């Protein structure tokens, strides 16, 4: 029985926390999708962004699981490499180019926001992002 309990706990231990993201801040980045992964436990995508120094950097954006994203209108085909987007993220605390997805605006003006813990700001276990007035531009 003890071995069964240990096995049941392993998936929980394998899942990381969101502590690497600064959920008190948001950053808006604009660029071109270079990769989209529709996978469990987290979907993700990468965006090529031109930074303030005029150099291209790739932002790695972590999202929620596909089943949660589908509740807010996402499909496996919502974004693809080459798409121009604007993305609101909670940035990585270490300052590297990346973050936790909050919302995306597609080239046609369609806006999708996140769902699930830490994504729609309705889960008290995850602090809400800063107000839109406190949103900072990408580096």
Locate predicted features.
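Boundary at the C-terminal end of the N-terminal hydrophobic targeting segment
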Residues: 12-16
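PEST-like low-complexity, intrinsically disordered acidic/proline/serine-rich tracts
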Residues: 19-139
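Sec-dependent signal peptide recognition
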Residues: 1-3
């Amino acid at each position: 029985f003890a071995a069964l309990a240990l096995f049941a706990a392993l998936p929980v231990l394998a899942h990381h926390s969101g502590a690497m993201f600064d959920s008190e801040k948001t950053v808006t980045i604009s660029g071109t999708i270079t990769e989209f992964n529709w996978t469990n436990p987290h979907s993700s995508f990468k965006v090529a962004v031109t930074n303030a120094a005029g150099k291209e950097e790739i932002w790695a954006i972590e999202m929620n699981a596909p089943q949660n994203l589908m509740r807010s209108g996402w499909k496996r085909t919502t974004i693809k490499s080459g798409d121009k987007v604007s993305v609101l993220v909670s940035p990585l605390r270490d300052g590297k180019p990346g973050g936790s997805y909050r919302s995306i605006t597609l080239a046609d003006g369609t806006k999708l926001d996140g769902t699930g813990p830490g994504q729609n700001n309705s889960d008290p276990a995850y602090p809400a992002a800063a107000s839109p007035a406190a949103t900072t531009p990408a580096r």
